[in-house]
Protein backbone atom coordinates (compact mmCIF):
# COMPACT_ATOMS: atom_id res chain seq x y z
CA UNK A 1 0.00 0.00 0.00
CA UNK A 2 1.41 3.36 -1.07
CA UNK A 3 0.78 6.34 1.20
CA UNK A 4 1.23 10.03 0.61
CA UNK A 5 1.19 12.62 3.40
CA UNK A 6 0.44 16.15 2.20
CA UNK A 7 0.87 18.75 4.90
CA UNK A 8 1.31 22.43 5.66
CA UNK A 9 3.41 23.50 8.64
CA UNK A 10 4.43 26.96 9.80
CA UNK A 11 5.98 26.23 13.21
CA UNK A 12 7.10 22.65 12.62
CA UNK A 13 4.44 20.95 14.76
CA UNK A 14 2.46 19.56 11.82
CA UNK A 15 5.68 18.56 10.04
CA UNK A 16 6.82 16.70 13.17
CA UNK A 17 3.56 14.73 13.38
CA UNK A 18 3.58 14.03 9.62
CA UNK A 19 7.11 12.62 9.87
CA UNK A 20 6.11 10.33 12.72
CA UNK A 21 3.10 9.07 10.80
CA UNK A 22 5.16 8.55 7.62
CA UNK A 23 7.97 6.57 9.22
CA UNK A 24 6.33 3.15 9.80
CA UNK A 25 4.68 3.23 6.36
CA UNK A 26 7.62 4.61 4.37
CA UNK A 27 5.11 7.19 3.12
CA UNK A 28 6.04 10.05 0.82
CA UNK A 29 5.98 13.41 2.59
CA UNK A 30 4.93 16.45 0.58
CA UNK A 31 5.11 19.82 2.29
CA UNK A 32 2.91 22.48 0.72
CA UNK A 33 3.89 26.13 1.17
CA UNK A 34 2.12 29.46 0.77
CA UNK A 35 3.60 31.45 -2.13
CA UNK A 36 1.53 34.61 -1.63
CA UNK A 37 3.26 37.64 -0.17
CA UNK A 38 1.79 39.39 2.83
CA UNK A 39 2.64 42.59 4.64
CA UNK A 40 4.62 41.45 7.69
CA UNK A 41 2.54 43.36 10.26
CA UNK A 42 -0.81 42.01 9.08
CA UNK A 43 0.30 38.58 7.83
CA UNK A 44 -1.17 36.68 10.79
CA UNK A 45 -4.51 38.51 10.78
CA UNK A 46 -5.00 38.27 7.02
CA UNK A 47 -4.27 34.56 6.92
CA UNK A 48 -6.51 33.81 9.93
CA UNK A 49 -9.33 35.71 8.23
CA UNK A 50 -8.73 33.65 5.08
CA UNK A 51 -8.84 30.43 7.12
CA UNK A 52 -12.07 31.49 8.84
CA UNK A 53 -13.65 32.23 5.44
CA UNK A 54 -12.34 28.94 4.01
CA UNK A 55 -10.43 30.79 1.30
CA UNK A 56 -7.52 29.35 -0.65
CA UNK A 57 -4.12 30.83 -1.42
CA UNK A 58 -1.41 30.23 -4.00
CA UNK A 59 0.80 27.28 -3.19
CA UNK A 60 3.91 25.36 -4.12
CA UNK A 61 3.77 22.78 -5.46
CA UNK A 62 0.88 24.23 -7.48
CA UNK A 63 -0.76 20.84 -8.06
CA UNK A 64 -0.19 17.27 -6.96
CA UNK A 65 -0.93 14.05 -8.79
CA UNK A 66 -1.91 11.40 -6.24
CA UNK A 67 -3.07 8.78 -8.73
CA UNK A 68 -0.19 6.47 -7.72
CA UNK A 69 -1.19 6.37 -4.05
CA UNK A 70 -3.64 4.12 -2.26
CA UNK A 71 -4.23 6.37 0.76
CA UNK A 72 -3.84 10.14 1.11
CA UNK A 73 -3.14 11.73 4.50
CA UNK A 74 -3.54 15.48 5.01
CA UNK A 75 -2.07 17.54 7.84
CA UNK A 76 -2.65 21.16 8.79
CA UNK A 77 -2.27 23.49 11.72
CA UNK A 78 -5.44 25.09 13.03
CA UNK A 79 -5.82 28.79 12.30
CA UNK A 80 -8.88 30.57 13.69
CA UNK A 81 -10.58 27.21 14.32
CA UNK A 82 -10.16 26.02 10.69
CA UNK A 83 -7.59 24.30 8.49
CA UNK A 84 -5.24 26.64 6.65
CA UNK A 85 -5.84 28.23 3.23
CA UNK A 86 -2.68 26.39 2.11
CA UNK A 87 -4.01 22.88 2.74
CA UNK A 88 -7.40 23.94 1.34
CA UNK A 89 -5.68 24.96 -1.90
CA UNK A 90 -3.65 21.73 -1.95
CA UNK A 91 -6.78 19.59 -1.61
CA UNK A 92 -8.52 21.65 -4.28
CA UNK A 93 -5.62 21.23 -6.74
CA UNK A 94 -5.20 17.45 -6.37
CA UNK A 95 -5.14 15.33 -9.51
CA UNK A 96 -6.08 11.64 -9.55
CA UNK A 97 -7.85 11.72 -6.18
CA UNK A 98 -11.37 10.62 -7.14
CA UNK A 99 -12.61 7.76 -4.94
CA UNK A 100 -9.41 7.51 -2.90
CA UNK A 101 -9.59 7.04 0.87
CA UNK A 102 -8.23 9.96 2.89
CA UNK A 103 -7.20 10.63 6.47
CA UNK A 104 -6.76 14.13 7.89
CA UNK A 105 -5.16 15.43 11.06
CA UNK A 106 -4.68 18.88 12.49
CA UNK A 107 -2.34 20.26 15.13
CA UNK A 108 -3.45 23.01 17.47
CA UNK A 109 -2.41 24.95 20.54
CA UNK A 110 -5.91 25.69 21.77
CA UNK A 111 -9.00 24.07 20.36
CA UNK A 112 -9.54 22.45 16.97
CA UNK A 113 -12.81 24.31 16.37
CA UNK A 114 -14.47 23.19 13.14
CA UNK A 115 -11.27 21.81 11.63
CA UNK A 116 -12.38 18.15 11.59
CA UNK A 117 -15.69 18.99 9.92
CA UNK A 118 -14.02 21.37 7.45
CA UNK A 119 -11.41 18.78 6.48
CA UNK A 120 -14.13 16.16 5.96
CA UNK A 121 -16.14 18.50 3.73
CA UNK A 122 -13.14 19.48 1.58
CA UNK A 123 -12.15 15.84 1.14
CA UNK A 124 -15.68 14.86 0.13
CA UNK A 125 -15.98 17.86 -2.21
CA UNK A 126 -12.97 16.53 -4.16
CA UNK A 127 -14.53 13.08 -4.50
CA UNK A 128 -12.36 11.33 -1.92
CA UNK A 129 -13.65 9.18 0.92
CA UNK A 130 -12.84 10.53 4.40
CA UNK A 131 -12.10 7.47 6.53
CA UNK A 132 -10.66 9.28 9.56
CA UNK A 133 -10.31 12.88 10.71
CA UNK A 134 -8.60 13.76 13.98
CA UNK A 135 -6.54 16.39 15.77
CA UNK A 136 -3.66 16.56 18.21
CA UNK A 137 -2.82 19.29 20.72
CA UNK A 138 0.69 20.77 20.53
CA UNK A 139 1.35 19.50 24.07
CA UNK A 140 0.87 15.94 22.79
CA UNK A 141 3.08 15.96 19.70
CA UNK A 142 5.98 14.50 21.72
CA UNK A 143 3.66 12.08 23.53
CA UNK A 144 4.59 8.65 22.20
CA UNK A 145 1.18 7.20 23.11
CA UNK A 146 -0.68 9.91 21.15
CA UNK A 147 1.59 9.48 18.12
CA UNK A 148 1.06 5.71 18.22
CA UNK A 149 -2.70 6.33 18.30
CA UNK A 150 -2.40 8.45 15.13
CA UNK A 151 -0.27 5.80 13.43
CA UNK A 152 -2.85 3.15 14.44
CA UNK A 153 -5.62 5.32 12.98
CA UNK A 154 -3.77 5.50 9.65
CA UNK A 155 -3.04 1.77 9.77
CA UNK A 156 -6.74 1.02 10.37
CA UNK A 157 -7.60 3.27 7.41
CA UNK A 158 -5.44 1.16 5.12
CA UNK A 159 -7.72 -1.78 5.75
CA UNK A 160 -10.86 0.18 4.81
What are these regions (language model features)?
Residues 55, 121, 145-146:
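Ligand-binding grooves and catalytic loops that recognize ribose/phosphate and carbohydrate rings
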Amino acid sequence: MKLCIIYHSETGNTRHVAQHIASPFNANLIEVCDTASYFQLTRFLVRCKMARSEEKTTIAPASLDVSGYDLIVFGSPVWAFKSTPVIHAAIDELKGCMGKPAVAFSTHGGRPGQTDETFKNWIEDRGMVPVAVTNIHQNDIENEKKIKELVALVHASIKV
